[in-house]
């Protein structure tokens, strides 16, 4: 069977250095993690690190060959949490979905997972079509929402979508809070389309 690799994915892997030098050479990981004005790292980044450790997931900050995408969904007023992982490795896409319940401690800013369900997922349209659409919406390159010029988020509650991108030489983390409220910005509109695509496919 002939394997067709999307051109967009090939370009991402080349740009990110995923097909780089010998495995004997340790690659320095370029990290992009948003911070607040005082230099403190994003709270959602801290919370995701906590959940990542509890779920015993690989730390993408250490690099991943070839590409892994994680979309963490955080609901502010309920204890539900969700995670979609899409992984491209050895010329093959795979997906996993996690449903979680978590206790939030506002005193020490921690989350403790109390319940977890995990299942393998496959898109209805197939991995080639789904991954092409996902990459065309620039999921690997979207900026952090707070960095979008002219966008002011005055909402205090609501769902936040946190994205981790891991390649052999790059790690990115970015967040979108209620992107459907800011669709006049193409970046937020793309995030809305990404979420719509995932809902339709899974």
What are these regions (language model features)?
Residues 19-202:
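Function-determining sites in protein domains
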Residues 1-29:
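Bacterial Sec-dependent N-terminal signal peptides
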């Amino acid at each position: 069977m002939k394997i067709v690799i999307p051109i967009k994915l090939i370009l991402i892997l080349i740009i990110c250095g995923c097909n780089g030098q010998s495995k004997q050479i340790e690659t320095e990981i370029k990290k992009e993690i948003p911070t607040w004005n005082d230099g403190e790292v994003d709270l959602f980044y801290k919370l995701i690190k906590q959940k990542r450790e509890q779920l015993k997931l690989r730390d993408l900050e250490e690099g991943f060959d070839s590409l892994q995408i994680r979309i963490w969904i955080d609901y502010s007023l309920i204890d539900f949490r969700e995670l979609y992982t899409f992984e491209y490795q050895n010329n093959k896409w795979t997906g996993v979905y996690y449903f979680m319940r978590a206790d939030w401690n506002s005193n020490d800013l921690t989350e403790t997972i109390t319940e977890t369900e995990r299942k393998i997922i496959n898109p209805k349209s197939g991995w080639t079509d789904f991954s092409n659409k996902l990459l065309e919406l620039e999921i690997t390159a979207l900026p952090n929402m707070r960095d979008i010029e002219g966008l002011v988020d005055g909402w205090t509650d609501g769902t936040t979508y946190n994205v981790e991108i891991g390649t052999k030489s790059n790690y990115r983390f970015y967040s979108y809070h209620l992107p459907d409220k800011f669709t006049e910005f193409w970046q937020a509109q793309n995030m809305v389309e990404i979420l719509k695509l995932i809902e339709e496919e899974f």
